[in-house]
Structure formats: structure tokens, C-alpha cells
Amino acid sequence: MKPIILQGHERSLNQIVFNSEGDLLFSASKDSVVNAWYTSNGERLGTYGGIKGGDGHNGSVWTVAVDSQTRFLLTGGADNAMKLWEVKTGECLYTWEFLTAVKRVAWNEDDDMFLSITEQRSGQPSVIRIFSINREDPRSQSTTPITEMRLSGSRATVAIWAPLSDYIITGHESGKIAKYDVKTGEEVQAVEDEHSALISDIQLSPDGTYFITASKDKTARLWDIETLEVMKVYTTETPVNSAVITPDRPYIILGGGQDAMNVTTTSQRAGKFESRFFHKLFEEEVGRVKGHFGPINTLSVHPQGRAYASGAEDGFVRVHWFEESYFRSRPFGDLEPEPEV
């Protein structure tokens, strides 16, 4: 499984996402730009921002999200701004300004709403906002959210939309997982006794019935989206920064590693800078893919399950296209059903 290595960032990666077709990958970095890449050959298609005095971000870009039509791109940064871009032209269509950094953005499944999370800082609370999008005239957007959730407890770090867009699921600094009503902004459910440290990533399953969380407590957990019950736990020896659920195959991929400041040697093994594959049902590790020279900060899986990508502290993105053997593998033999190829 030889990777395609994407070299286009000068600093560490914060978030990478495939588009719905899987032919493009978008990467957000601490170097203030977002890049778009062809996943088939690693060619850079374009850059959003990065021009001095232009309308890009001024500082780290923490988060990126692309709509299901690959028409619009949302980004959020350390400059307290959220930006709407046209994918095709690279043009910034609109900018929202906040009082603190934008740590996460996400589209709902109908592409008619999106959420943003702003940081708790300088006396400002962590705020989750739900906006509607004007797709007809994208340069004319409302600065007023439909719903605003000002959090009094632990700050939110990540969030996803539940199917039908009635609820959002949030992960928090304390390890709490919560469900919020999109219309009322009320917290309708919360679990505070599963993860014991910051939630670094949250990603939905392909069918929308469950989701996975990654945490600094060195575990990833699989949750039922209706009940918020933990179904499976995947345990490692280092903080988990990102976790994905592979479509069609029974695997979970985890990325993380010892924080850069705590690594005393450049050995990949010492820092555990590998993508780690776990069996979804049996919770056992079944394989590793090495290559990065720093902790993996972000993972994304191809929507059809044909590849996955990792972005790391070393500034590189690696796209791994799975070989035929991956789709036929049965690490637990007769305990598993025959793969559908």
C-alpha cells in the first residue's frame, strides 16, 4: 500500500476531508492556507488563501468542511473568522467575524445549514452556532445564527450533525459527549463518565446510526447515536487525535502519538506515529501503517472506503489507496462473514 505523499504545507495539519465523490481532498493547516488535491495522483488543484493582504485567513486554519456537491467550502481559523469559499474558483465569498477562534465547522446532510464552534477564551464562553446558508446568492449571508448555544460548562471542541439535522452531537474538553436540539439550542442528553480527557475528533458512521470519538485519554469509542451508549472501546498507549470508521469493511483507523513536545527521540516507534487499524467488532488491533515523523493530527476516509488519508504534525498528508488484499482480508478467520467483493 504505497502512499501518495502530498507536500504543500509549511506547518502541521489540523484537519483533512475528502469530498463526497472521493476524488478531491482538502487540507487545513497552521500555515494559514487550505489546499485542494486530486486524490488519484496527489496533484495540487489549488489553494484557498495564502496571499498577503488577500482575503484568506491570517493565522492557523483549524477546520475545513466541503458540502456534498463540492460547490462550497467552509473554513475556520485562529483569526476569529469563518469563511465561505467557492471550490471551483478559490474565491472567498463571505466572511463571518467572531470574538474568538473558530475551532470546528460542519455542514448538515442537506447542505442548507452548518454549525460553527468558537473557542472559550479571554472571558468569552464557548459558543456553538447554527447558520442557514444562502445558496442562491452566496455573497449575501446572514450574520445572525438560527440557534446559538452558549456553553457554561466544559468548552466544546468538536461536533457532528445527527441524521435529519434535528440534533448535533458535541465532544468537549472534559471528555463529555452531549446532544443538542438544533431548534431550541437545549442540551437534551449528556454523558460525562466515559472519556476522561479532551475529545479531539468525532466522525459519523456511513449509515448515520453510530459515531466514533477520539480522545486524549488514549482511547476511541463507538457510540449509538440515539442512546449515546458506548458500544465498543479501542485502547492505545498514546493520545488519540483522530478516528475514522471504514465503509464496507469492519475496521476502525486511529491516529495520534505522543505530543511533539514530549518526544525525546525522532524514532517513529518511540512516538507511535502510525495509523492503527482495529477490528470494529472485536476491538483488537490488526495492523499499522507507518510513515509520518510526527503525531497524526487528522484522518479522513474515502466515502466509498477505497482509501484513507492522514495529516500530521510533520506537515505532510499521506493518501493510502487500499490494495485488493485489504478487501478480502479476514483477520479473525471463520469468526467473520465472507467479505462482499
Swiss-Prot record:
Residue spans crossing the bilayer: none
Keywords: Cytoplasm, Initiation factor, Protein biosynthesis, Repeat, WD repeat
GO molecular function: RNA binding; translation initiation factor activity
GO cellular component terms, semicolon-separated: eukaryotic 43S preinitiation complex; eukaryotic 48S preinitiation complex; eukaryotic translation initiation factor 3 complex, eIF3e; eukaryotic translation initiation factor 3 complex, eIF3m; nuclear periphery
Domain of life: Eukaryota
The protein's role, per its UniProt record: Component of the eukaryotic translation initiation factor 3 (eIF-3) complex, which is involved in protein synthesis of a specialized repertoire of mRNAs and, together with other initiation factors, stimulates binding of mRNA and methionyl-tRNAi to the 40S ribosome. The eIF-3 complex specifically targets and initiates translation of a subset of mRNAs involved in cell proliferation.
Assembly notes: Component of the eukaryotic translation initiation factor 3 (eIF-3) complex.
Protein name (record): Eukaryotic translation initiation factor 3 subunit I
Organism of provenance: Cryptococcus neoformans var. neoformans serotype D (strain JEC21 / ATCC MYA-565)
Gene symbol of the encoding locus: TIF34
